[in-house]
Amino acid sequence: MQIYPLRLLPNKIDFDFMNFKKVSYSFSIILSLISFIWIGIYKFNFGIDFAGGIVIEVRLDQAPDLPKMRGVLGELGIGEVVLQNFGSERDLSIRFGSSSEENLMKNIELIKASLQSNFPYKFEYRKVDFVGPQVGRQLIEAGAMAMLFSFLAIMVYIWVRFEWYFGLGILIALVHDVILALGFMSMTKLDFNLSTIAAVLTIIGYSVNDSVVIYDRIRENLRKYHKKNITEIINLSINETLSRTILTVITTLLANLALILFGGEAIRSFSVLVFFGIIAGTYSSIFISAPILTMFANRKFNKKVIER
């Protein structure tokens, strides 16, 4: 039985990506500067994880309808409200952002009254705690360290598998993707919480995977076409992997779209940011990480790159 691969593009496609190198560099620099300026002016919409807040622990007489409950509490106008089960399905944790002292008790009573009037459950309020912003600062530091270590691990991996200048190309693309993702988060006022840190790490992984696929094809074509220059090799490699890249990004975006539409508020920031990051990562793997290799066109590519 013969298997026919799924293709969205013809087998022989010869689009000159490298002809847009300067345009793509300029475009990326402008977007990065806009992101920096926007973040500097408007900052981030820090969620409860980082800004601190109130935690109310409740036990109900039956399993609650969490999506409906999130919708009701989200309409109170007191900011982000996070509901989660802990322990059994009847135990509920309600978290919302810290307020001024005079509004603190008012918001707690507002939540209690809203739950009592909209749901037929019996509520047993077990504990009310205040989580200070100091914990948030520790989480921000931990998230920053996680991203730093991921950058370093990726650099070492690419250096071992290819050569240091390949790692430089990926590092520049990753910094570009993270800056755009943070700028997008600031512009859209997505909650900056632990799930968005996970989203940024997911974007990093996706972008690296895309770039490594192209780099592998570049290395393979360096073995096959000794007379072609590096610009021709990169163009050929991007075109040969383009169908795979488009198929992968479409299927991933469709899966992520389902999370955005049906995942609820609990993972909205994560899914929206990953959706944007997949697009940014695909763009950077084609127009940034691969074209950067032309900076080394005047030096002979290390034989280790071709032989590995």
Swiss-Prot record:
Protein name per its UniProtKB record: Protein translocase subunit SecF
Keyword Disulfide bond: no
UniProt gene name: secF
Function: Part of the Sec protein translocase complex. Interacts with the SecYEG preprotein conducting channel. SecDF uses the proton motive force (PMF) to complete protein translocation after the ATP-dependent function of SecA.
Transmembrane segments annotated in the record for this chain: 28-48, 140-160, 164-184, 194-214, 246-266, 272-292
GO molecular function: protein-transporting ATPase activity
Entry keyword annotation includes Secreted: no
Lineage of origin: Bacteria, Pseudomonadati, Pseudomonadota, Alphaproteobacteria, Rickettsiales
Subcellular location: Cell inner membrane
Protein keywords: Cell inner membrane, Cell membrane, Membrane, Protein transport, Translocation, Transmembrane, Transmembrane helix, Transport
